[in-house]
Amino acid sequence: MKPTQSSAVGPGQTVPNGASPSGNGKLSGVEPPVLGGPEHSDYYLLDNLITDEQRALRKKVREFMDQEVTPIINPYWERAEFPFELVPKLAQLNIAGFQIAGHGCPGMSNLTAGLVILELARGDLSMSTFMGVHSALAMTSIGLLGSEEQKERFLPPMARLEKIGAFGLTEP
């Protein structure tokens, strides 16, 4: 590992990844993050705290957004339409239902769900909002408050994105 730009280390602070403080209070031997990678803005090295499985899911969602969504999304924004033809492809990620366990849902941890939502939003906010309303609002309401019959009736097709959850609001 070649020495690179370093940051200050105070008394009693630990240094990341085996880097060693030099005599001038700076870290040496720390590689900078790769530009454009998810680590690029990981100033606190939080990426080191997630599992390989979480990294793989984050990468899978990021690749989906980069390959399937961002190349086509702008005209949808201009027409004020949602790209419903992407829903079957989105279903293949098996992320609908986020933290709900069972009924075809992935049962993610809160952290994993946050990573997924972050990657969806990074690619396009409308996709993140869509999955947030569908999974976190509609599906979680059924998962927490529905009867077993309602859960069995609605959650499996919603997890496959065959049925879409929504939110309606009226004002007096």
Task: Give each language-model segment a name.
Residues 1-53:
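Intrinsic disorder at enzyme termini
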Residues 33-34, 43-44, 54, 66-67, ...:
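Alpha-helical interaction segments
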Residues 46-47, 54, 79, 105:
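Short basic coil micro-motifs at the edges of alpha-helical modules that engage polyanionic partners
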Residues 63, 68-172:
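Glycine-rich flavin
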